[in-house]
Amino acid sequence: MKKFKKIILWILGIVASLGIIAYVSVTNHPQLVVGVIQSFMYKESSPNSYSPLYDPIDGLKENGQYLKSEIAYSKDYPNSFLDITYPDQNLEADRPTLFYFHGGGFFGGSKNMGDPLAASQSTYLIDDIVSKGYNVVNVDYALVPDYHFPTPVIQMNQAIAYIKEHAEEYHLNMDNVVLMGSSAGAIMVAQYGSVLANQEYAQLLNIEPSIAKEHVKALVIDDAPLDYAKFSLGTKMLVGNYVSETIYLSEEEINAYNPISHVNKDYPASFLLGSEYRTDMVSLNKALKQAGVENELVDPLAEEGLEKPHGFVANLRTDPVSAKAFERMMTFIDDRTKK
C-alpha cells in the first residue's frame, strides 16, 4: 500500500509540475495559445497582409447603399485598407463621417468579418448606422504576432489623415466626425480620445493627432477592456500579448495602455456601452464625469438587471435591449453632428 501511495504522489507531483511549467510558459508567452487560435482562423494564410483580401468594389450594394472598398490608406503597415459606405448613390450629400474600428482581441477580426469574440453580427451594425444618414469609414489594422501596441492606434491616425487628405475626392466631411470602436477597436478609440485631449499622452504614444479635437464631435466606445489590473487571466493573455507579449506588464506599459488616467476636460463627448467589460466602462464614465466631459453609459446589468454578451449592440435586429441601446447611441451622436 505504501508503495502505491508513493507512486500516486509521484504521479501527482509530475502533473503539478507540468501544470506549473505550462502556466509559466503561456503567461510569459501568451502567443503560444493565441497562435493556435490564429492557426485555426487563418489556416495557411497570414493575419497580416499588404494586399487586400477581396477584390475592390465601387458600386451599389443589394440594400441600396453605395460601397467603395479596399482603399489603401498607407503602405507602412499591413492590413492598411478601409471601406467607405454611403447611404445611397448620392455621394456628394453633406453627411457626418463615422470611422469604425472592429474588434477581435488584436489577433483576429477584420472590417469584413467584424469581431470573432463578440456574439453578434457587427457588419449589420455598419449598415444600420449608414441607414441613419452617416458616411461610414470602416478601417482595418495590423494584428499580432507581428505588430503590437501602439501600432493599430498609429494606423488609426494614418487612416484619419488619409481621409482628411482625400476628403474632397470621397465627398467626406472631416469637420464633423465620430470615432467608434467595438472591443479591441473600442480600446483604440478610448486611447485616441486621450491622444486628442492630452498632449502628454500623445507624446507618450509618439502620435501627433491628424485631426483637430474640435472636429471630433463624439466617440462611441463599445465595451473596451481598459483597467488591466482587474482583467481575468484570459483577457490579460490577449491584451498582454498585444502590448508586450507577456501578461506581466510593467507599470509604464499599463500606464500607456490605459487611457482612463489620462482623461481631462478636453476629452471628446463619449457614448459608452458596457457588458462583459462593464466595470471598465463604469470607471471611464466616472473619470469623464469628474473631468466634466459629456458622456452617457448604457449598462444593461445596472439598468435592467440583464447580462448581455460582449458587443451586444450589434444584435439590434434581434434583441430589444440592443435595439434600444442602438437608438440611444444614435440620438447621442445625432445631437452632436446634425444640429
Question: Which stretches of residues belong to each language-model region?
Answer:
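Alpha/beta-hydrolase superfamily serine-hydrolase fold, recognizing
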Residues: 3-339
